[in-house]
Amino acid sequence: LGKHRIMCGDSTDAGSVAQLMDGEKANLCLTDPPYGLANTVSEKNNYDFYNDSKDNLKEIVAKFLPLAQTVAECIVLTPGISNQSLYPAPTWIMAWFTPAGVGLGPWGFCCWQPILCYGKDPKLAKRMGSHPDAIVHTEASEKFGHPCTKPINFWRWLMERTSEFGELIYEPFSGSGTTIIAAEQTGRRCYAMELSPQ
């Protein structure tokens, strides 16, 4: 895909990740990991390639996150508010505010989502000053046949907040390809992994 790469493979497998990266190290891992949607959205739409159940999600996190830390300088991910406890304590938490509400939980619609950050803030590390760590976003995502597509303008904001022009982005759960599109639109390269051949 021009300067980008996409590989059909498993981001919880060290050999597959090494093959995708081919010795390069990413400046940023930006991803929207599985949410544990089996028996609901994923199963109905044949997306359950990760055995994406709540029971299995902890194992997915335990495998992909350490691998991502070996190939990327920092990691930024959107776990979904109900899955945040499955992840190790982050270095920082940014916030995505969605006034209309996203995702029905046990207490109703949640109006914000955590963005977990691991590693140093790239802007502060490069002495570029402090930048906002919250975004208010009301744009609806285009589904593209995928259950959890992120709005492209939100994803672009997150990419520009956490990386620089020309840098390399690693995406372990490519899904509908939003990270590749955002990388193309913002002048970055993206190496993406997706288990589903679709």
What kind of feature is each model-predicted range?
Residues L1-A192, S196:
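Core catalytic lobe of class I
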